[in-house]
Amino acid sequence: YTLSLHDALPIYGEGIGIKVCGDMDIDEQFEYRYYTPYFKGSGVTSYADVSVERRIDREAYVGICEDTKVGINLVFYLQNMMEYLRERQLGGRSIKYSSVTLSGLCNEGIILLPVLKSKEQEREQQEDVHNRMLLLSAAKSGDPQAIESLTLDDIDTYSKVSRRLISEDVFTIVDTYIMPYGIECDRYSIMGEILEYRLTRNEITREDICIMKLDVNGLLFDVCVPKREVMGEPAVGRRFKGNVWLQGRINF
């Protein structure tokens, strides 16, 4: 038996709470097995294909999103497990879904200033990202020319970055990034541009919580972090850097 996100108690703030999972015996006595904090994101992060796998250690599931924007498979803790199990029971293996909404729980982070770019540089960067996405899609289909082009692009990028690192800081070269962090498969180190920013309050501890919508390598998702653990002043256009526990829900 699992409490849904709407039933999870207690509710600590806007979209923030604790989900409890456990067993209900014949006397309707609930005994919990584990509980996890959650943070519900907003909007849509990706329309890419998603596969779901059960964790070995407990009754929980992770989603694997294959989005070409980042070039790696993103693994996230599945928030709407009961909804997924219900859809699987009704539809078998042919589960239909529309999109994925990701979110990140973070303990601490740093605010960085944005990289100064001209309109022409922004346009060229968008074109490069679009072309790379097309090449990645073609490479996944087995196109040898696309694979070769990606390899040459990576070599060229490595060479350019190595030269610039002699006189520049890495955070003036890299706008945003997302990469695995630690030994858990759903932990990531991220840096993204702040698109939206607001404050909410933990109703239990009365602590202020920063909620930021980030653009991380073209992926848009919300991150929550305690305000007192953020070094710097968050603002739209600046960048946030931190380590997150990536969660998400599949929109059926």
Q: What is each residue range found by the language model?
A:
Residues 1-2, 7-9:
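Short, small-residue-biased leader/transition segments that mark boundaries at the very start
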Residues 10-182:
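Long, hydrophobic alpha/beta structural blocks
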Residues 74-76, 222-227:
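Short amphipathic beta-strand/extended segments with alternating polar/hydrophobic composition
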Residues 179, 198-200, 228:
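Eukaryotic intrinsically disordered and solvent-exposed regulatory patches
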Residues 181-193, 238:
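Short coil-to-beta-strand transition motifs
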Residues 195-223:
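OB-fold (S1/OB) nucleic-acid-binding surfaces
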Residues 227-242:
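Short nucleic-acid-contacting surface segments enriched for D/E, G, S/T with interspersed K/R
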Residues 245-252:
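Short, Lys/Arg- and Gly-enriched loop/turn segments at beta-strand edges
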